[in-house]
Amino acid sequence: MKVGIIGAMKEEVTLLCQKIQSCQTLTRAGCSIYSGFLGETNVVLLQSGIGKTSAALGTTLLLEYFQPDILINTGSAAGLWPDLKIGDIVISTEVRYHDVNVTAFGYEWGQMALCPPAFFADKKLIEIVLECVKNLNLNAVQGLICSGDAFINGDQALDRIRTFFPKAVAVEMEAAAIAQVCHQFETPFVVIRAISDVADQASHLSFEQFLCIAAQRSSTVIENMLPILAETYCSIN
């Protein structure tokens, strides 16, 4: 099997990139792509850049040219769930846009035209991530992750997310675009993010301070889940 992994920022992919064996590197449309093996698993790791457009472009490149069997989105996120702390893991059950508004045409807030309201992560992948997180003794929450082209640091933007998506556990800037592309390619996906801040007025300071911690945590989860993923995938195919 082949696993696709996508992260927005250099800090979010560096730890995994450093461990790829027989690594081949190329650049396409501003995306850095690294292919090789993590342990015995064939992987393609892509750094897309920040935001929904960059994420959608990178995901399309990854799925079209490398054709991974599944896709994992890694990186950092801002926590919305009250019990989440820096370094805790959030796992997507579903992903939605928080900044899309075509409600004038009868769609839900956050629903892109001609798309479902939410994009649902693969249940088997969620189970594998939960097993891995438990083995690593990390605190994790699974639930709705919201995405939009804004860094959330309190005020009206945060209030709007809490109003329309009261069950959201985290917010970030790429996952929904990645999920939409996976939906259109019919590729199973899961989002694994570690908390770097809590979306308040000081979130930009927290993000800068704790980004590397969040990146390390999410990368560790992915690295440890790959053997379980390979074994499980082989057993069901």
Swiss-Prot record:
UniProt KW keywords: Amino-acid biosynthesis, Hydrolase, Methionine biosynthesis
Q: Give the EC number(s) listed in the UniProt record.
A: 3.2.2.9
**EC category:** hydrolase
Q: Which Gene3D superfamilies match?
A: Nucleoside phosphorylase domain (3.40.50.1580)
The alphabetized list of GO BP terms reads:
L-methionine salvage from methylthioadenosine; L-methionine salvage from S-adenosylmethionine; purine deoxyribonucleoside catabolic process
Annotated GO CC locations: cytosol
Catalytic residues? 12 (proton acceptor), 197 (proton donor)
Q: Which reaction does it catalyse?
A: S-adenosyl-L-homocysteine + H2O = S-(5-deoxy-D-ribos-5-yl)-L-homocysteine + adenine; S-methyl-5'-thioadenosine + H2O = 5-(methylsulfanyl)-D-ribose + adenine; 5'-deoxyadenosine + H2O = 5-deoxy-D-ribose + adenine
The residues the record assigns to binding substrate are: 78, 152, 173-174
Q: Which InterPro entries match?
A: MTA_SAH_Nsdase, Nucleoside_phosphorylase_d, Nucleoside_phosphorylase_sf
This protein's pathway reads:
Amino-acid biosynthesis; L-methionine biosynthesis via salvage pathway; S-methyl-5-thio-alpha-D-ribose 1-phosphate from S-methyl-5'-thioadenosine (hydrolase route): step 1/2
Q: Does the keyword Transferase apply?
A: no
Entry GO MF terms: adenosylhomocysteine nucleosidase activity; methylthioadenosine nucleosidase activity
Q: Which Pfam families does the record cross-reference, listed alphabetically? A: PNP_UDP_1
Q: What does this protein do?
A: Catalyzes the irreversible cleavage of the glycosidic bond in both 5'-methylthioadenosine (MTA) and S-adenosylhomocysteine (SAH/AdoHcy) to adenine and the corresponding thioribose, 5'-methylthioribose and S-ribosylhomocysteine, respectively. Also cleaves 5'-deoxyadenosine, a toxic by-product of radical S-adenosylmethionine (SAM) enzymes, into 5-deoxyribose and adenine. Thus, is required for in vivo function of the radical SAM enzymes biotin synthase and lipoic acid synthase, that are inhibited by 5'-deoxyadenosine accumulation.
Share what the entry says about its subunit structure, partners included. Answer: Homodimer.
The text of the family note is: Belongs to the PNP/UDP phosphorylase family. MtnN subfamily.
Name of this chain's protein: 5'-methylthioadenosine/S-adenosylhomocysteine nucleosidase
* Organism listed in the record: Hamiltonella defensa subsp. Acyrthosiphon pisum (strain 5AT)
